[in-house]
Amino acid sequence: MELPKLLISLFLFSFSSFFLGAESDYPQHSNLKRLRPNRLFVFGDSYADTGNIRKSLSDSWKIPYGITFPQKPSGRFSDGRVATDFLARYLGIKSPIPYTWKDYAGKERLLYGMNYAYGGTGVFKTKDNPLPNMTTQIDYFQRVLAAGNIYSPSDLPSSLALVSVAGNDYATFLALKRPLTELPAFMKQVVDQIAVNAMRIHKLGVNKIVIPSMQPLGCLPSITVFNSFQRCNATDNASTNLHNYLLHKAIARLNNETKPSTFVVLDHYNAFLTVFKNKGPEPGVSRFGNPLKPCCVGVNSSYDCSNVDEKGEKKYIICEDPKAAFFWDIFHPSEEGWRSVYSVLHKHLKAIWI
């Protein structure tokens, strides 16, 4: 997720009263087959992108991104693996090949699925970003299916789709200086479009679609930098919760309309908070000294992770051990951060599976 720095003034309203009972609106289906999918299709933004953006257009292809895995930049917005990789690992499959690299991958590699996510994008067009939004990403998926030379209709029922929406639409809302009084209505538009996208993916043949809730935006280092990375912004998190409440409602409606297909909200929000608050031996979850402080930052507010000056000299600082940091840069978790989040989510994944 590439939120602009003006995200610091994110949201002014608290909608806490709307959040009660959100989980109860999520229907449970008792007739689900307990079989894990064998291929993964991915749509969304930089929390899921594994290398779709051209190298000339993205910091994710610059040093020090990829320093942990694969020890060089790979187009991932992290020092290593991201959400897509850990979900694929849970499924027991290789991480799906990025769409833009499909012509360079062998047929066997493509059978694990395909990743259509592009960093910095949203469900709608995002500001100053020519990359494909989610509707266009699904268009690409539909074209691949129509070609018929990689996937057959019989492949799709045993597939899973991951739909990542981490906040770029709201960053664009703020960048365009729209009145904050319009924000709740815009949130509903975003969530309604997520539901439209998820249903479209289902109608193309995918029977299981996972949509992560939005991570606590008020805990991003781009926000917490203003209190020396000491605490999350409660107002921003309350507004994030409105998005998540609306998402649960929308997904509940889809589940009521499309049995036995299941749309699942994967609880990134509370998984992030669980990791932040971990003070003891939570199985598989790292204990971070200060989880809000990122590993890689610019030397000052004019620079970001990976920036160099006109002489090629580094204008960023990296922490001594990326594994000791939950966040890699001011927006994105580190590999160890993502690993801890998906360790928390392991029980949830096991409970909803398939």
UniProtKB/Swiss-Prot annotation:
GO BP, sorted A to Z: lipid catabolic process
Pfam families: Lipase_GDSL (PF00657)
Glycosylation sites recorded in the entry for this protein: 133, 233, 237, 256, 300
Residues at the active site: 46, 329, 332
The keyword Lipid metabolism is assigned to this record: yes
Secreted keyword on record: yes
Signal peptide, first to last residue: 1-24
Subcellular location: Secreted
GO cellular component, one term: extracellular region
Keywords: Glycoprotein, Hydrolase, Lipid degradation, Lipid metabolism, Secreted, Signal
One of the record's GO molecular function terms: hydrolase activity, acting on ester bonds
Known EC number: 3.1.1.-
Family designation: Belongs to the 'GDSL' lipolytic enzyme family.
Protein's UniProt name: GDSL esterase/lipase At3g09930
Organism: Arabidopsis thaliana
